């Protein structure tokens, strides 16, 4: 079996790594299976530093489609054309896509148009907010998929409510846990934690990346006000530069943040 696996952004590799190791093990055991890893972005993407693949114990992508437009429509069109060409040169029996990104949806459409089976890892995820681009991506990808791998029973229920045949739905659990377990013995305390004087179990970790939230000034202020009121622990927030600038404009500051 020839499987083409799609990665559209750095976070996808965290979920793909266990699959690559499993396929490698199956092949070593005599199974007739091969995997080709396709990254829709550029090989010069600075977020894909060599240590990422070393840490995840996985190979770098076999091919880069070099589509990195920020405009949705240009990116979508670029991936459709580039991935169609990729499948013509390297046919596959199954195309596996991850999460709910634009490349996820685009590659699903190409595969389906070419009569290739589509597998969706982390299927059935719903926000029920059609203003969120990822909601549209996820719904379209799920609708095109032949194999829907879910992380939880809520996802199974979501798919059932939209009329998905249950024979196509497979509950496999949260694959990120596989990555965490695999690397657990290799994890090291970040040097930055010592510099900041953080103690074990005595700090909060905050992530913030939903555009729908970042564009809602009232909600954003309320979240930080609530967090700062409810705890006196230091807050570690690895934020994108855009988010940092947003907080600065809104005058959201604290010695503990």
Language model features with spans:
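Structural beta-sheet core signal
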Residues: 5, 37-39, 120, 171, ...
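A generic structural motif
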Residues: 25-36, 231-235
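Donor-nucleotide binding loops and adjacent catalytic segments primarily
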Residues: 50-53, 188-257
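A nucleotide-sugar donor-handling region in carbohydrate enzymes
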Residues: 42-43, 47, 66, 144-218
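Short N-terminal binding/cap micro-motifs at the start of the first secondary-structure element
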Residues: 12-16, 45-47
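Active-site and donor-binding regions of nucleotide-sugar-utilizing enzymes
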Residues: 4-7, 14-22, 28, 52, ...
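Conserved nucleotide-sugar phosphate-binding/catalytic loop shared by glycosyltransferases and other
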Residues: 31-75
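Cofactor-binding loop segments of dinucleotide-utilizing enzymes, especially the Rossmann-like FAD-
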Residues: 8-9, 39-42, 123, 174, ...
């Amino acid at each position: 079996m020839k499987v083409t696996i799609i990665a559209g952004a750095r976070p996808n590799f965290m979920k793909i790594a266990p699959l690559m190791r499993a396929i490698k093990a199956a092949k070593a055991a005599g199974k007739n299976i091969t995997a080709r890893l396709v990254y829709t972005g550029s090989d010069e993407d600075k977020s894909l530093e060599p240590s990422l693949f070393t840490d995840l114990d996985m190979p770098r992508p076999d091919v880069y489609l070099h589509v990195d437009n920020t405009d949705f429509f240009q990116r979508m069109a670029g991936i459709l054309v580039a991935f169609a060409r990729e499948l013509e040169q390297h046919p596959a029996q199954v195309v596996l896509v991850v999460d709910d990104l634009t490349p996820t949806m685009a590659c699903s459409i190409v595969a389906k148009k070419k009569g290739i089976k589509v597998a969706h890892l982390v299927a059935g995820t719903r926000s029920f907010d059609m203003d969120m681009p990822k909601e549209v991506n996820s719904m379209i990808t799920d609708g095109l998929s032949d194999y829907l791998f879910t992380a939880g029973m809520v996802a199974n229920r979501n798919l059932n409510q939209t009329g998905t045949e249950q024979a196509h739905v497979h509950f496999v659990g949260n694959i990120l846990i596989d990555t965490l377990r695999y690397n657990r013995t290799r994890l090291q305390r970040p040097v930055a934690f010592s510099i900041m004087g953080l103690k074990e179990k005595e700090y909060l970790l905050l992530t913030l990346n939903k555009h729908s939230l970042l564009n809602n000034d009232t909600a954003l202020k309320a979240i930080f006000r609530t967090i700062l009121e409810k705890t006196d622990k230091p807050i570690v927030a690895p934020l994108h530069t855009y988010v940092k600038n947003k907080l600065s404009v809104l005058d959201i500051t604290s010695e503990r943040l």
